[in-house]
């Protein structure tokens, strides 16, 4: 009999579960203040829904043996977009939804078998808010949610902002047969490979300059304007930054504009964001998202104007980040009381006392064996991390 969990799986212990719940509740309270309602999409979906029209690769989906092609969701957005365009199609837009739940990703290493990585997520989806207004609400909400987590200056929280169309505009001048290769090298920040491609000199120079454009938004926008000229896209990005920069400063979150930013899933066709913090050894991404109008369009009636934008927090990553910095919240079940008794005949009154404490809202637990005296009971309580003993003698 196997005594270890499956490859990629983890046992969550009571403290882990309690902190995860606390983090998710802090985030949900923020979402609800912004008018978002909670939904729970199914863990199982049809493969064509999960693959989101090619945005997610089939090897990333944990497939389930069934009469039809089913899989476990690798992310939440596709399932919620499907529900929004079918079960919730009659509801007035914009539609504001939030969720919490586990996602499952299939990962394969060259010399290893399949690993199934389960991750707890908390996030929002905003359907029917097009353009700048939807993007601005999403980023303001993300900053608000991030500010309600106990992150410190040592975490150096940074919000990376990119846009799918930025790189596409630059790639329009590239020979079509080379575009996917150039995109891969640019997103991978591979200067050497980019320099070796058969590209016109000015075009290569512009792409190499693009690799340097990453950092403070105003400076990056100026650099992009020098490369692209004044465009509506840059004007919209400039306006978006102006809407969020003051709130980001108050929240202690640095803004970084990165034209080469490319997320793991190719869901996005507009603005893209990732909230990154400094861990003990390396940066840790705790939230990500963006605009996915094409995905919503896929689930919508032909000819309908559809739009969607959203983000999700990786709850486990947040918990581990707080654990490393010793910034976890105090015991989350209140000040627990231990009820102890002296002999077997006192079990009944001890349980009655336990019930009274529970009815008054006091967390309490019963020690199941008789104790010789109160000192023994207090010693047991101390070992269990409990300060208060209620004695039935």
UniProtKB/Swiss-Prot annotation:
<dbReference type="InterPro" id="IPR004517">
    <property type="entry name" value="HisZ"/>
</dbReference>
<comment type="subunit">
    <text>Heteromultimer composed of HisG and HisZ subunits.</text>
</comment>
<keyword id="KW-0028">Amino-acid biosynthesis</keyword>
<dbReference type="InterPro" id="IPR004516">
    <property type="entry name" value="HisRS/HisZ"/>
</dbReference>
<keyword id="KW-0963">Cytoplasm</keyword>
<comment type="similarity">
    <text>Belongs to the class-II aminoacyl-tRNA synthetase family. HisZ subfamily.</text>
</comment>
<keyword id="KW-0368">Histidine biosynthesis</keyword>
<comment type="pathway">
    <text>Amino-acid biosynthesis; L-histidine biosynthesis; L-histidine from 5-phospho-alpha-D-ribose 1-diphosphate: step 1/9.</text>
</comment>
<dbReference type="InterPro" id="IPR006195">
    <property type="entry name" value="aa-tRNA-synth_II"/>
</dbReference>
<dbReference type="GO" id="GO:0005737">
    <property type="term" value="C:cytoplasm"/>
</dbReference>
<dbReference type="GO" id="GO:0004821">
    <property type="term" value="F:histidine-tRNA ligase activity"/>
</dbReference>
<dbReference type="GO" id="GO:0006427">
    <property type="term" value="P:histidyl-tRNA aminoacylation"/>
</dbReference>
<dbReference type="InterPro" id="IPR041715">
    <property type="entry name" value="HisRS-like_core"/>
</dbReference>
<dbReference type="Pfam" id="PF13393">
    <property type="entry name" value="tRNA-synt_His"/>
</dbReference>
<comment type="function">
    <text>Required for the first step of histidine biosynthesis. May allow the feedback regulation of ATP phosphoribosyltransferase activity by histidine.</text>
</comment>
<dbReference type="GO" id="GO:0000105">
    <property type="term" value="P:L-histidine biosynthetic process"/>
</dbReference>
<dbReference type="InterPro" id="IPR045864">
    <property type="entry name" value="aa-tRNA-synth_II/BPL/LPL"/>
</dbReference>
<protein>
    <recommendedName>
        <fullName>ATP phosphoribosyltransferase regulatory subunit</fullName>
    </recommendedName>
</protein>
